[in-house]
Amino acid sequence: MLTKKPVLSPDRCFSPEPVQRRLAHQFFDSISALPLVCPHGHVDPALLANPAARFGSPTELFIIPDHYILRMLYSRGVPLEALGIPTRDAPTETDHRKIWQLFAEHFYLFQGTPSGLWLKDELTNVFGVDEALNSRNAGRIYDYLEGLLALPKFSPRALFKRFNIEVLCTTDAASDNLENQRSLHEEGFTQIRPTFRPDAVVNLDAPGWRENLTKLESSIGREISSYATFVQALEERRAFFKKMGATATDQGAATPYTTSLSDQEAEAIFARALIGKLNPGDVEQFTGHIFMEMARMSVEDGLVMQMHCGVMRNHNPALFERFGSDKGADIPLNIEWTRNLHPLLSSYGNNQRFRLIIFGMDESTYSREMAPLAGHYPTILLGPPWWFHDSVNGMERYFNQVMETAGIYNTAGFNDDTRAFVSIPARHNVWRRVACNWLAGLVTRGLVDEEEGYDMARALAYDLAKSAYKLD
Amino acid sequence: MLTKKPVLSPDRCFSPEPVQRRLAHQFFDSISALPLVCPHGHVDPALLANPAARFGSPTELFIIPDHYILRMLYSRGVPLEALGIPTRDAPTETDHRKIWQLFAEHFYLFQGTPSGLWLKDELTNVFGVDEALNSRNAGRIYDYLEGLLALPKFSPRALFKRFNIEVLCTTDAASDNLENQRSLHEEGFTQIRPTFRPDAVVNLDAPGWRENLTKLESSIGREISSYATFVQALEERRAFFKKMGATATDQGAATPYTTSLSDQEAEAIFARALIGKLNPGDVEQFTGHIFMEMARMSVEDGLVMQMHCGVMRNHNPALFERFGSDKGADIPLNIEWTRNLHPLLSSYGNNQRFRLIIFGMDESTYSREMAPLAGHYPTILLGPPWWFHDSVNGMERYFNQVMETAGIYNTAGFNDDTRAFVSIPARHNVWRRVACNWLAGLVTRGLVDEEEGYDMARALAYDLAKSAYKLD
Amino acid sequence: MLTKKPVLSPDRCFSPEPVQRRLAHQFFDSISALPLVCPHGHVDPALLANPAARFGSPTELFIIPDHYILRMLYSRGVPLEALGIPTRDAPTETDHRKIWQLFAEHFYLFQGTPSGLWLKDELTNVFGVDEALNSRNAGRIYDYLEGLLALPKFSPRALFKRFNIEVLCTTDAASDNLENQRSLHEEGFTQIRPTFRPDAVVNLDAPGWRENLTKLESSIGREISSYATFVQALEERRAFFKKMGATATDQGAATPYTTSLSDQEAEAIFARALIGKLNPGDVEQFTGHIFMEMARMSVEDGLVMQMHCGVMRNHNPALFERFGSDKGADIPLNIEWTRNLHPLLSSYGNNQRFRLIIFGMDESTYSREMAPLAGHYPTILLGPPWWFHDSVNGMERYFNQVMETAGIYNTAGFNDDTRAFVSIPARHNVWRRVACNWLAGLVTRGLVDEEEGYDMARALAYDLAKSAYKLD
């Protein structure tokens, strides 16, 4: 496979201005060989725990599990059934080569999007495809990829080594037995660590909450019939996760509202949840209270606390009923941090044992609330641009709106936050390039010295993520 | 009239970086001759229906009807009376040459604004004025323009042909008899189409609501004494508009709140409106319900639905009382789409017969709500940057904040949304230039191939608007 | 002290694109010698009133009073005690050379921040330090600065002359006797003017409200036992401030909510405040009403009204209890202008005797609300980017989001809003550079003529601030 012009420009993400571009290359060259630190993501640990695991067909690797791909195709009229997504009650396409062809015919939809950039990078740098995917070469490329994916050197484990990943944190339910991590550790893969994510039991409106609680009961080996027992369960599970290598927790909620309920109030809400008779406001009050409790536990056990806020999950009820969650139908919400975090920060904001990393998709809060909070409280770090904003422009907005107030050292560097294992190097590549180009812009504008630029590039590419998540 | 340096730079809107600028020119050259598609605007069809129509004096063309011009002059202390705006009760300036002189003396206020750019383009490219307007040459330029405007080749019809407008959609009240469109169609001008805009009757707080309803009654030839009849009236009028060539409807509201009222609730509110005794919240509830009804009708008759949300009309009560609406005193509001559109999208968001184009002036919702919604729902397209944001920076923000998530193919291309007929080419010119410069930036940054750039330029300049409004 | 490369780039804040950069230099050269107009700030007039006043140690000058510096160091774990901040009850570091060393060791935190840029400028241009501060040279630089600061030519008065400040407005409590200004005026320093800031008495939840009221009583020489007397007191004090050279007032509040209470309502709230029994909402209602009253008084006495809105003061209660206000723990809030200012603008928005300058830190309101309001009402001007946004990117966002709608002539130019006297030239330098670079961008993009660029540069650097505050 040969073409004249590379599919993937060596200058990608860099300013066309020659002096800035040259400097961006220099910064990038100085950090591009650093290992990848992946402190927050959603890779299935089973992929790595089982040496015989394979990615399946190109369609199983690139299309079916990727909600960014699904949503864009769906938005232009491609039914999810035609993409092989399992439905509750109807047949779905099973010919993966045909799905791939359909995808290739619509690949133009991803022009200028991060998904398009990642995919080009993966095809080029992971699989050696050196032509742009289109409807004519789709079948040929499919066959080529299918051949490679069957080879041991394209197994998840082999790629894990090739990707130079120094540490990879997974995200795991509070009730998870972490068997995959255990077996990986026994094999020496201690750099794969769990993260404690209790959303399924602490958000009282989570789908299947009662079943999730039952799983939590199983994990601690006793019944959870009161709020007090529930909190004990969380504490026990955190201790277990920590023993299994976790350094952090994570929680998602529609809003970063925090509040401190009395024990009686918390017990009353929990009791109503158990009998399935929640009052209006119970969900928000309980989640807001658990944020406080999780902060308290972080002070006690030293796990870094993460908050991901501001998404309305499953916005499309018909799609959710038919195909379930994570099909690209989650839509961000506007949020407010200054007032909502006030109770939590009043209690724990100055505590040297506490660390909180916050993520949101309301970019209007970057310069107004997030950077000022991180630029004052010793306990707060800012997570990188999240989800829809994990893109060239999204990162540039983040740098330009956050860094003047918070400085880079109040951020947590980068994390890829992905379940698409093969996209990890591509995502870090974009971050590192955009960061280096931003720094080159600061230097060419006389705002930062060249020497400082090299230090900052390394911090953004590597050091900050490690130290933020206590991985050093 | 000769000057050395052109008033209008051939490089306008393009980056000074030479490589990007060259490519922007190439993209622009490839699309600049494409016809103009104008699927949403406010040109008075009478201007075109009457072959003898003229624009009047330069002041009547450029100043008196342009609320962008009026608001800026008013904001710096120029009374609207001095600009010839009719008042309810007092004399107003009638010497148009004097008004033009006053305008020229204040023309520096428009430095760096879109109004300034449009006006320079119109003077140069429509009228051949090749010097910058100022207080010294104002009278001379006035006389020159006055001479031209009397000529048949500067009649609205002549300019319509010269402007290479492929289709022009007007905006018309629900009760409009569309006589102008009818006579235009009979003359062969079938490319001039109406748009169904029922704001005056569906927004129960619209000025003169009762009179507007009376007109609607006349248009259907019977009394509207109930909500049920009202809905029938809307359906009948939509059918009439569709027969007269309409492909779309439009609605404006302070908020995109949608809700489904029961028939009894809707009847009760409508009954209160008829007797002029609305309860608090009635207006918002009724408009929110009508949004749902308009979506249902769109599913049935195939008209594209448009929503323009987030403006407080007539913010300045003293000005409104004296001079009426549309004098530059409408101020945008913050809005929310994710929760507000949820009811409507839950009902119609996946319906293949439905199409919804949304517009807002709360740019914080571009990346947070609008692009994610359009990047998921097959029914949603994003309208171009609207009103105050129909500008070089406004468009760049739109491209940078929308396209990574929604891609360009979930947008409706450009529309000029103007009542200033003569400004139409200038407005499309700015859009096409900014789009080409943005694409050149993507190519020089290695994010899009040059070949893709040409395709995207054509789509943004022409194809997307046609297909979004079902004009192809 | 000699190094090869200057610490402060002569190209700082300018685009690396050569044509734009050259033009930016030309614009900057044309305005850099203009005097500084400082119509809003917080310099202590005692510094200037007393010819023998000195700045103290380098630590007293640069660190202890600067809440930008304090918050960043605190955010990375440096205790305020170690920085010499007085606490209510515990010892604090008193060795200023040691504090300076600690600061230098953490100076990398300010990379790319406005504080870092200002400090480099001050060290270079005010004190002639020509090397970058670091942990190794910290002691040497401290000694050097300490030596200079003892010299008469580095007294506040000497620097005032050297800085070429044409006018400097201070900010003073309503009860202030303005003795410093009086003595300055007697010495001929009439360019130092007070500003009337009644927050401490009109915001009923201001710390020490009762004591503040007592001071106000003293200043007018009689008791304030009713709302009516309170309003009279404000009027009397405004008259006194005006006599002492004030041309403006200023008010800060969490929100720009305005409302008109009846006399009875206002009296009732004031009576509750006097007995310390406020109802929920009283504070916001009263402040909102006083905004209206202050506007009325501005119409009567011609003082320019300023509103600074959208900050939650003292967000960190533990820090506040220990160290008091203004230690970097104020966090911005989202705000709304369109609805909140509606009552005030309905009453005074068209009044030729009224002028209102508004400031906020919610940048999402720049293009959505602030620019449209200023681009319509003849009474509104926009203040420059404030507080956290007084930075290179903050200014660029302001220019790009405000100017297309409001034009530059509806803004109030620049003010430094600082209590750090020595940083004044550095802050104006950043504004002037960013403005010139922005204008050079407009010219090189063909949006503004070069000649217009020179006019606009002068307006932004000098004229607008003078005329906005009636200082011409």
Curated annotation (Swiss-Prot), chains A, B, C:
The keyword Isomerase applies. Signal peptide: none annotated. Its EC number is 5.3.1.12. Pathway: Carbohydrate metabolism; pentose and glucuronate interconversion. The keyword Chaperone does not apply. It catalyses: D-glucuronate = D-fructuronate; aldehydo-D-galacturonate = keto-D-tagaturonate. One of its GO terms (biological process) is D-glucuronate catabolic process. This is Uronate isomerase. It comes from Nostoc punctiforme (strain ATCC 29133 / PCC 73102). Belongs to the metallo-dependent hydrolases superfamily. Uronate isomerase family. Keywords: Isomerase. SUPFAM superfamilies: Metallo-dependent hydrolases. InterPro entries: Metal_Hydrolase, Uronate_isomerase. One of its GO terms (molecular function) is glucuronate isomerase activity.
